């Protein structure tokens, strides 16, 4: 399976720097990168999607066409920008913004109905990890229960919460075991990405694991040269 690199800017990139980054990345890449490189700026960092060398996606959207949803963007906003790729289920939205499994299912089903490419994020906390691998498997299985695992436009990203933003990635053995388990659950055509303190120093080793189909990169993607280095490993 072709390897993938995704940059999640979260809320860390200044707006105009984000715009400049996207334009410079477009100049750097080639057409064959279009379905292999993805960038998720924050809402203000989004531009009309005329990019031909990478895929532009949104970090979040409310599951409605439009309406009285103060502070949200909806499918019509994204479609107007020609954006059809969306992150759903990131741990920061689950934990900080209290997005429940039922709401994530609603969001998934709505954007599946719009034929969006959905990057669905899962991952366990440290307490669960410390209980052992059986507990991790049960936790991750529950996170996948409410979505259609045979949806053809699905990508799953495994991000252990305890590794996000800590500068301490999961060990290669942990990634190998966890991805091996998840591959047994997922449709064989569904790409499975790893995220959690991925950087230019560890990306090549992680991508070397057969069951890792790509990377979801946070802070290490904020500097274009770092992201370009990671892309070179694909």
Swiss-Prot record:
Quaternary structure and interacting proteins, as annotated: Homodimer.
Q: Report the PROSITE patterns cross-referenced here.
A: TIM_1, TIM_2
GO process annotations (BP): gluconeogenesis; glyceraldehyde-3-phosphate biosynthetic process; glycerol catabolic process; glycolytic process
Q: Which organism is it from?
A: Helicobacter pylori (strain J99 / ATCC 700824) (Campylobacter pylori J99)
**The protein's role, per its UniProt record:** Involved in the gluconeogenesis. Catalyzes stereospecifically the conversion of dihydroxyacetone phosphate (DHAP) to D-glyceraldehyde-3-phosphate (G3P).
Q: Which residues form the active site?
A: 90 (electrophile), 159 (proton acceptor)
Q: What is its EC number?
A: 5.3.1.1
Where along the chain is substrate bound? 8-10, 165, 197
Traced from the root, the source organism's taxonomic lineage reads: Bacteria, Pseudomonadati, Campylobacterota, Epsilonproteobacteria, Campylobacterales
Entry GO CC: cytosol
Pfam families from the entry? Answer: TIM
Homology family: Belongs to the triosephosphate isomerase family.
Pathway(s) the chain acts in: Carbohydrate biosynthesis; gluconeogenesis; Carbohydrate degradation; glycolysis; D-glyceraldehyde 3-phosphate from glycerone phosphate: step 1/1
What is the name of the gene encoding this protein?
A: tpiA
> What is the protein name stated in its UniProt record?
Triosephosphate isomerase
Where is this protein chiefly located? cytoplasm
Q: Which InterPro entries match?
A: Aldolase_TIM, TIM_sf, TrioseP_Isoase_bac/euk, Triosephosphate_isomerase, Triosephosphate_isomerase_AS
Give the reaction(s) catalysed.
D-glyceraldehyde 3-phosphate = dihydroxyacetone phosphate
| PANTHER family in the cross-refs | TRIOSEPHOSPHATE ISOMERASE (PTHR21139:SF42)
């Amino acid at each position: 399976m072709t390897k993938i690199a995704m940059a999640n800017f979260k809320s860390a990139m200044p707006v105009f720097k984000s715009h400049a980054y996207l334009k410079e990345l477009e100049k750097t890449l080639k057409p064959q990168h279009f379905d292999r490189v993805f960038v998720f700026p924050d809402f203000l960092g989004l531009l009309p999607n005329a990019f031909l060398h990478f895929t532009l996606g949104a970090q979040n959207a409310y599951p409605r066409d439009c309406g009285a949803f103060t502070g949200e963007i909806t499918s019509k906003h994204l479609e107007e920008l020609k954006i059809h790729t969306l992150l759903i289920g990131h741990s920061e939205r689950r934990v900080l913004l209290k997005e429940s499994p039922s709401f994530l299912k609603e969001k998934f089903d709505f954007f599946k109905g719009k034929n969006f490419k959905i990057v669905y994020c899962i991952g366990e906390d440290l307490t669960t990890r410390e209980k052992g691998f059986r507990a991790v498997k049960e936790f991750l299985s529950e996170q996948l229960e409410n979505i259609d695992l045979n949806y053809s436009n699905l990508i799953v990203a495994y991000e252990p919460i305890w590794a996000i933003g800590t500068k301490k990635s999961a060990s290669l053995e942990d990634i190998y075991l966890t991805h091996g388990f998840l591959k047994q659950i997922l449709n064989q055509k569904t790409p499975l990405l790893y995220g959690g303190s991925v950087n230019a120093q560890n990306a090549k080793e992680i991508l070397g694991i057969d069951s890792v189909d790509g990377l979801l990169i946070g802070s290490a993607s904020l500097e274009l040269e770092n992201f370009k280095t990671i892309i070179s490993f694909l």
